Amino acid sequence: MHVFVTGATGWIGSAVVEELLSAGHNVSGLTTSAAGAQKLQKMGAKAYVGKLGQHDLLRKSAAESDGVIHTAFIHGLSSMSLGMRVRLFAGALNGGIVSSFMRILAETESGAIGALGSGLENSGRPLVVASGILYLPQGKVATEKDSHVSNVPNRSFSERAAFNFIQRGVRASAVRLAPTVHGDGDHGFIPHIVQAARKNGVSPYIGDGANRWTAVHRLDAAKLFRLALEKGEAGAKYHGVGEAGIPFQDIASLIATRLNVPAVSIPTSKAAKHFGMLGGFIGLDNPASNEWTRQTLGWNPEQRGLFADMDAHYFNSAAK
């Protein structure tokens, strides 16, 4: 297959490109820079330089492909245009920075997925989009049949935008990723949590720390995207979860041991002071099952687990 991948030089997208190439597929990828284009070309993929707002480019690239994997994501200010930044801070004055960011993210994602879907319309070809486990129903082990909680920020807009094309002849599915997609080179949640503990001299958890986090290795996630592309069902929501529920206290305790700082309980009200923007996520109890995903696609996570990966990569000098 000829597969078009957005976010092709990102943390997850670059692993997806490598997985597809190793499986014998041809790949073209969207990247935002000339340096990214050079990286893709060295990997053996064709490169397009552009952004998610360039809908004509997305539509044309999708139409020329046999299928699309959408992993591109706006992670922060560095990923935003000047216009987006102005809108973000203007919106922050009317409802908060998180709400403003999520509105911009939803509009950008929905528009980009709409362009990709229109390029695949009436073809029966696959469109696989990245979504998230966060904010599925709390306090239970969420399954692939569950929908996101509607009154909090989540990635459900990506799923809705893709599934709108099912009735228009597109085999759309979603891969819901664990909040912790780990591996060598990770710059996501866990490195920020380690950095906060190193900076503040303490490794906290919320309350009793029994709330559960999911995790998946980057390479296992990449394999799941490939399988969803090749075999995925229209409307399916696959769970990119290698470990279904790790008590956050265990994560905090490992960090405390490796940094030689105390692990302590703090109330929710102090989470933002220590963790910054991640404060609202730390106390979530969001375990999730991958049973249906494994049975349906034959996906078997094979890489090392979160704690082994943390020991190997997350406490060296480069992680400071």
Residue map of PLM features:
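N-terminal Rossmann NAD(P)H-binding glycine-rich loop of SDR-like oxidoreductase domains
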Residues: 3-25
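NAD(P)H-binding glycine-rich loop region in Rossmannoid oxidoreductase-like domains
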Residues: 29-111, 118
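Glycine/proline-rich active-site loop of Rossmann-fold NAD(P)-dependent oxidoreductases
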Residues: 156, 182-191, 199-200, 227-238, ...
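Conserved beta-loop-beta element that borders a ligand/cofactor-binding pocket
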Residues: 160-184
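Substrate-positioning beta->alpha
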Residues: 185-194, 206-229, 236
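Mid/C-terminal beta-alpha module of Rossmann-like enzyme folds, strongest
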Residues: 222-278, 318
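Conserved C-terminal active-site "lid" loop/helix of NAD(P)H-dependent oxidoreductases
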Residues: 273-300
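Amphipathic terminal alpha-helices
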Residues: 304-320
